[in-house]
């Protein structure tokens, strides 16, 4: 029955791709991600200006992720049948307002309020991004459209911190956020001009969000999503101490490694649609298996700089398949409830990121330098096994 509903949902899709709207969504995503991580490179001047410690200033990133998790869970219940075009415009306005509130913040409270606004937009936008994409392009083009959106994410992750640091030294941290607000205005204009009307789901399609987990293979999919992202953050959060102490990279060398990782991630995302067209399940099982082998290689031969640098590139290429692949899984296997599935997915990812980083840090402090790698590799291997054995992928119609 669920398959029949999904097939009908896909059959009602668009006949021709609306690439202008897809790129508008991608631009909004890139701006959201960039602003999310701007404080990472601006903590010191922000803390000094507001008279707080850098640790306290760092909570401006934490509160964004925390609010985003709850926003992703409840946004579809709140917006219900509202035209998604207006919702995306609202998120772009919230992005702009957040930047301005942070720019003019004269207290830590106002700073957190501004960052909470960003969390609302970030979580809500991610929750509906997959369903938006599948309504802007034909079913066969969805992986390509998703690769465009996640390619924008990769670019934002590469440039956010260095760009913020560079501009902050020239124009000051407040003007960096003013510049980001201008980007938010551009988001609003582009979305208004390019995004068509996208009515909310009809009442007969409404279903309790968590009842989706009772569908065959869905709970297994969410567990696999959790393990893959927890595995990523268990290692990547601590890549600096691992690479500097295990492989002996200095700061400049580590910068090049991270840049290589970012470029590889962008390349992997750009070509992910070609892999996913052949087999979504193979990509979702093969990528974490390759990452598990990469973690094992680092544990055994990571003291060699060449090996360590090569693994960073392989890791960036392989993990790039993971977010695009799971979003494609939602558009294929949960097409009739893509928004609610996206809400659960985003919340699971946010929780996984937090747990992965926390457990990885505990392991590093208590079990040694290689323990985050072992934890990450183990989680990636389990992910591959769960996907191969339990996750179902609906064939493309």
Swiss-Prot record:
Parts of the chain that traverse the membrane: 22-42, 55-75, 86-106, 108-128, 148-168, 176-196, 216-236, 256-276, 282-302, 306-326, 344-364, 367-387
Periplasmic side of membrane: 43-54, 107, 169-175, 237-255, 303-305, 365-366
Stretches assigned to the Cytoplasmic side? 1-21, 76-85, 129-147, 197-215, 277-281, 327-343, 388-397
Q: What reaction gets catalysed by this protein?
A: inosine(in) + H(+)(out) = inosine(out) + H(+)(in); guanosine(in) + H(+)(out) = guanosine(out) + H(+)(in)
Any one Pfam family here would be MFS_1
Family annotation (Gene3D superfamilies) = MFS general substrate transporter like domains (1.20.1250.20)
Tell me the protein family, please. Answer: Belongs to the major facilitator superfamily. DHA1 family. NepI (TC 2.A.1.2.26) subfamily.
Q: What is this protein called?
A: Purine ribonucleoside efflux pump NepI
């Amino acid at each position: 029955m669920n398959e029949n509903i999904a097939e009908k949902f896909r059959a009602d899709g668009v006949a021709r791709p609306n690439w202008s709207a897809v790129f508008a969504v991608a631009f909004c995503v890139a701006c959201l991600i960039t602003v999310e991580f701007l404080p990472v490179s601006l903590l010191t001047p922000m803390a000094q200006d507001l008279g707080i410690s850098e640790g306290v200033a760092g909570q401006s990133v934490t509160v964004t992720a925390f609010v985003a998790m709850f926003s992703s869970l409840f946004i579809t219940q709140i917006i219900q049948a509202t035209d998604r075009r207006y919702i995306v415009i609202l998120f772009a306005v919230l992005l702009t307002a957040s930047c301005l509130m942070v720019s003019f913040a004269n207290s830590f409270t106002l700073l957190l309020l501004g960052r909470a606004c960003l969390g609302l937009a970030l979580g809500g936008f991610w929750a509906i991004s997959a369903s938006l994409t599948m309504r802007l392009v034909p079913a066969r083009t969805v992986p390509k459209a998703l690769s465009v959106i996640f390619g924008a994410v990769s670019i934002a992750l590469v440039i956010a911190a260095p760009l913020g640091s560079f501009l902050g030294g020239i124009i000051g941290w407040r003007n960096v956020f003013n510049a980001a607000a201008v980007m938010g205005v551009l988001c609003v204009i582009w979305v208004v001009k390019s995004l068509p009307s996208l009515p909310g789901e009809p009442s007969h399609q409404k279903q309790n969000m968590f009842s989706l987990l009772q569908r065959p293979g869905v709970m297994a999919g969410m567990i696999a999503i959790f393990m893959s992202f927890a595995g990523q953050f268990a290692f990547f959060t601590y890549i600096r101490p691992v690479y500097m102490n295990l492989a002996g990279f200095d700061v400049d060398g580590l910068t090049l490694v991270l840049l290589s990782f970012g470029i590889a991630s962008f390349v992997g995302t750009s070509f992910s649609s070609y892999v996913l067209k052949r087999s979504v399940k193979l990509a979702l099982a093969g990528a974490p298996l390759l990452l598990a082998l990469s973690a094992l290689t680092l544990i055994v031969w990571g003291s060699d700089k060449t090996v360590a640098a090569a693994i960073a590139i392989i890791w960036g290429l392989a993990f790039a398949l993971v977010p695009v692949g799971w979003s494609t899984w939602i558009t294929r296997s949960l097409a009739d409830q893509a928004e609610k599935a996206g809400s659960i997915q985003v919340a699971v990812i946010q929780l996984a990121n937090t747990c992965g980083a926390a457990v990885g840090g505990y392991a590093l402090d208590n079990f040694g330098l290689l323990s985050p790698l072992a934890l990450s590799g183990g989680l990636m291997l389990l992910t591959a096994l769960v996907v191969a054995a339990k996750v179902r992928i609906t064939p493309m119609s």
